[in-house]
Amino acid sequence: TEDLPVDVRFMLPSCVPATPMDESGANLDYRAIDSFYDYPRVQGLAEMMNSYGVIHNDAEVVSKIVASQAHHKKIDGHAPDLVGNDLNAYIAAGVYSDHECHDLNDAIAKLQRGQFIMIREGTAARNLEALVPLLCDKYVERCMFCTDDKHPNDLLEKGHIDYIVKKAISLGADPIMAVKAAGYTAA
């Protein structure tokens, strides 16, 4: 991607297969992904979906987290509906961000514990309307926009992050806060 006109960065998959019952055609354990951390465009570990494994110290999950941390990389989360001590354990393990916030209380609980929140507005899952109040002085420094599973037709017809900025403003967000979540915080 070095010669592309856009600066593309990557996150390594954390859960392939997604669950032990899935058949993905591959099993990417920590040894399979470890050498990829040396690539400068690799930013960290993507979507740590196995929250149960994080909370209960599953050896493979912990190995992936430790490897990412050893390379000074970020760990993105995927933790819908975690609360209380389970949420504390998940975040304390080093999971840096989450895009699975379905309501304002969930997002604020994660922000108060130090996570960054990716406000998702994709094709299947749309959380912007519920989370637009986060686009304020108190929270915007830890909030950014993401699409997560946006269909190519939606990208062509509506746009990407630019669409989310416009929609956030139409929902009452301060334009400066919307632009900040689109660019500054994400960078």
Model-derived segments and spans:
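Active-site-adjacent beta->alpha loops and helix N-cap segments on the catalytic face
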Residues: G53-I65, V83-G84, A107-A109, R126-E129, ...
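His/Asp/Glu-enriched, well-ordered alpha-helical/loop segment
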Residues: L134-A187
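Glycine-enriched alpha-helix->loop->beta-strand junction motifs that scaffold or abut catalytic
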Residues: R41-V42, H72, A89-S97, Q112-M118, ...
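Hydrophobic faces of well-ordered beta-strands that scaffold small-molecule active sites
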Residues: V8-L12, Q43-E47, I75-G77, S97-H99, ...
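Conserved, mostly hydrophobic/aromatic
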Residues: L45, K110, A178
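Divalent-metal coordination cores built from histidine and acidic residues
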Residues: T1-H72
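Active-site-proximal loop/turn and secondary-structure-junction residues that shape catalytic pockets
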Residues: S14-V16, M49-S51, A79-V83, D103, ...
